[in-house]
Amino acid sequence: SCSSGCSDCNSDSCQCTLNQFTNSDSCCC
């Protein structure tokens, strides 16, 4: 699952990705 923002994306099983089209980051676990 993914949530917007990477400030709380600190888990080893999560990955922060940047959407180049919307210029927004998301945390995917």
Swiss-Prot record:
This is Augerpeptide hheTx2. The cysteine framework is C-C-C-C-C-CCC. Its main location: secreted. It is found in: Secreted. Expressed by the venom duct. One of its GO terms (molecular function) is toxin activity. One of its GO terms (cellular component) is extracellular region. Keywords: Disulfide bond, Secreted, Toxin. It comes from Hastula hectica. Contains 4 disulfide bonds.
